[in-house]
Amino acid sequence: MTDPLIKRSGIQEEEDLTTLKFPRDLKDAKFLLNSEVAILLEHRKGISESEGTEFPQNTLLIHLYYNSINDIIRTFHKTLAYAEKFSRYKNKTSIKQVRTALSKQNLEEFEIASLANLCPEISDEAKSLIPSLKKMEDDELQAILDELSNLRKFN
């Protein structure tokens, strides 16, 4: 399925998730697992708390208004809550095991993060959620999903 044309910087780019064609600004993006986001945000929160601020002042632009700062803080906490709620893997070791297992497969970075975040149970579900996986045979994809399921059980 092809998404509508998106206009960026005066140039029209076509996005197509079935072929993993992303806009230029996402070309070299690192796709994260929700669990990785949660760990990063918890770390940032810990730094803030040790500095005695809700949000580290050195990362804010001085000209931001009070309401904007509150919006940033509120967004930070909402993002952290979301990432924690939907984290499938609770520690760095589990995340590393999942990334290592999926990296051994013939998967793109986006597919790795999507599979780890969504945790589909069967290949048809995975292909519906992540259209680029339609290139894979069902039994090959199911083996990957079964391995992911086993890793989650021991998490």
UniProtKB/Swiss-Prot annotation:
InterPro entries documented for this protein: HRDC-like_sf, RNA_pol_Rpb4/RPC9_core, Rpb4-like, Rpb4/RPC9, Rpb4/RPC9_sf
An individual GO BP term: transcription initiation at RNA polymerase II promoter
SUPFAM superfamilies linked: HRDC-like
One GO location term (cellular component): nucleus
GO molecular function: DNA-directed RNA polymerase activity; nucleotide binding; translation initiation factor binding
Statement: the UniProt record of this protein carries the keyword Protein biosynthesis: no
Family membership: Belongs to the eukaryotic RPB4 RNA polymerase subunit family.
Subunit structure and binding partners: Component of the RNA polymerase II (Pol II) complex consisting of 12 subunits. RPB4 and RPB7 form a subcomplex that protrudes from the 10-subunit Pol II core complex.
PANTHER family assigned to the protein according to its UniProt record, in alphabetical order: DNA-DIRECTED RNA POLYMERASE II
Designated name of the protein: DNA-directed RNA polymerase II subunit rpb4
